[in-house]
Amino acid sequence: MEQDDPVEALTELRERRLGALELLQAAAGSGLAAYAVWALLLQPGFRRVPLRLQVPYVGASARQVEHVLSLLRGRPGKTVDLGSGDGRIVLAAHRCGLRPAVGYELNPWLVALARLHAWRAGCAGSVCYRRKDLWKVSLRDCRNVSVFLAPSVLPLLEDKLRTELPAGARVVSGRFPLPTWQPVTAVGEGLDRVWAYDVPEGGQAGEAASSRIPIQAAPGPSSAPIPGGLISQAS
């Protein structure tokens, strides 16, 4: 599979999910029961979000979480996970020193699960999970942003990031790359691949004077630098 091909990556993701569903049906003996659990976790809150902005929950693997941390570790400032699901990335970020760490998730069941995980880890008072539509979250004070979103919403996310993020911020996108931004570095293969993007110095991303913005590559010890260094602005 081509490393940066979102179509092939999405196909692989669907194949993985199908295999998991088949195993679930075989073990439970009832597709209805599986569907009930699935709907309970994924549907609350979606009715208030336009269809094109809905992002289904698929938890990050341990390898994906580690790749995210490898690209953010040691960076100062606020870290946020947009669509934080069960909170595993936020909790891991706090543990490796990325503080404050905040997760935004619309599904109330997943927010509750994330808070339970934080409580069990002894971090209930240290990490923050907020039930909020990620499209309504202000990113103007964020220095580090992680996202694991569907390819269909990434063009809209680019607009939000470009408009709101301050200079020097870093965006880490898992599973699928941002469609028009040029990454400074990447780590992992296939669905475990994670890309890093830096907002240039000299103003917010939406305030660039030219149509292409130079950025600084800062690969981590386990990451692979990517040639180039330009973020394409929307016309």
Curated annotation (Swiss-Prot):
The keyword Ubl conjugation does not apply. Signal peptide: none annotated. One of its GO terms (cellular component) is mitochondrial membrane. Its main location: mitochondrion. It catalyses: L-lysyl-[protein] + 3 S-adenosyl-L-methionine = N(6),N(6),N(6)-trimethyl-L-lysyl-[protein] + 3 S-adenosyl-L-homocysteine + 3 H(+). Its EC number is 2.1.1.-. The chain crosses the membrane at residues 20-42. It is found in: Mitochondrion membrane. It is a single-pass membrane protein. Residues 215-235 are annotated as: Disordered. Residues 1-22 are annotated as: N-terminal sequence (NTS). Residues 43-77 are annotated as: Methyltransferase (MTase). One of its GO terms (molecular function) is protein-lysine N-methyltransferase activity. SUPFAM superfamilies: S-adenosyl-L-methionine-dependent methyltransferases. InterPro entries: FAM173A/B, SAM-dependent_MTases_sf. Residues 43-77 are annotated as: Pre-methyltransferase (preMT). It is an enzyme of class 2 (transferase). GO terms for biological process: peptidyl-lysine trimethylation; regulation of mitochondrial ATP synthesis coupled proton transport. Keywords: Membrane, Methyltransferase, Mitochondrion, S-adenosyl-L-methionine, Transferase, Transmembrane, Transmembrane helix. Belongs to the ANT/ATPSC lysine N-methyltransferase family. The pre-methyltransferase (preMT) region is responsible for mitochondrial localization. Mitochondrial protein-lysine N-methyltransferase that trimethylates adenine nucleotide translocases ANT2/SLC25A5 and ANT3/SLC25A6, thereby regulating mitochondrial respiration. Probably also trimethylates ANT1/SLC25A4. PANTHER family: ADENINE NUCLEOTIDE TRANSLOCASE LYSINE N-METHYLTRANSFERASE, METHYLTRANSFERASE DOMAIN-CONTAINING PROTEIN. This is Adenine nucleotide translocase lysine N-methyltransferase.
